[in-house]
Structures are given as structure tokens and as C-alpha cells.
């Protein structure tokens, strides 16, 4: 009988937001042993403090086609695998009297090229869809934006990751990295519940700490300026 030592994992993930939770689930589904560390509780950083908009990528279509394609791909994935976390509200890009109505076709063409469904609608239809819209609008384009519940999405990923063997440790503050030369072998962590310092080891350490990722990078003598 093989007894797993909880100090050792294939992957350690630092950060319990949407990104960390998604990585934990993906790794666990691939059969890797996973330890996720969060210094507070899940989704208490930027994940729990954002507007919850699920971008279609339309806003980037004309000026940044690559970002637009990435957005719509993620949008479609989340609608497929996390429908219970998503509300498909759609979004409107409106044209006002001071705008160039001809740009509407440029916008639709760019959206279509990026794989984003964009539909021109008349002002009356736009007003029916959104009664608070500026009544002076000349036209509108409907795109597949939506809203997503960030906490619910994070919790769902965490639960599925744990069901597939991941170890989720909240109240665990990473205080340093364990290094061998230029290679990170693990982390030093403070367990707030038991008031003790521990060392955990993994073949791969993922920095998913959001804005605090700069501090984690500094433990490895890396300069990643985030603020």
C-alpha cells in the first residue's frame, strides 16, 4: 500500500481565485496531484471584486483581433461547461448622432472575422431590449456578451478539483519559495489555523496570486512589475 506524503505534489498553485481554481481543476482532471494554497478564503481577491462581465470580445474586434478571438473562445467554453454560472444577457454597441454610422459595418465585419456573432438591429428593437438606452441612437449592434458569477464559478472549479483529488488549503500564506539554483522546488507557507510554518514541495509551482503575484515572483528574484 502506497501512502501519499501530503508535503509533496506534482503541482502547487498559489492563489484561490478564478484562475487558480481553474488551473487546479484542469491539472486534477489530468491525473496530477495538486495542492492549492490561498492565504484567505476562495475568491477574496480580484475574483470577488470584479463586475462579472463575460466579454464577447467585440470591443477588441477592430483594434486587437487576437484578444477578440481569445475572448469569444473563453466565452463559449464557459457557456458550455459552466452554464449555471452564466447569464446570457447579450450586449449592445450603439451609434449616436455624433458617431459615424458607416463604422457599424466595419465593426460587424471585424467581429465576424474574429468568430463573434454580431447583428445589426434598428433603434426600436434596441429600445425594446434595453429601455434605458439613449433614445437618440441611430442604430445598434447586438453581441453575445453576458454576465458570470465569479464566486460560483470559482467554487464550482474548486469542488470539482477536490473531487478529483486536489488538496485545497485556505488560510495558508506563502512566505517564500524553496529553490535549487534557478529552479523552484516548493514553497514555504504559514498555516494560520494551526499557527505553524511548513514546507511543501512540487515539480511545478504556479503563481496565480493576482496582483500579489509580484511579491511571489520577487521570492524567485524575478522582477514582474504589476503596480
Locations of the language-model features?
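Glycine-rich FAD pyrophosphate-binding loop
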Residues: 28-48
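Flavin (primarily FAD) binding-site architecture
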Residues: 207-222
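Core beta-strand elements of the Rossmann-like FAD/NAD(P) dinucleotide-binding domain
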Residues: 7-9, 194-204
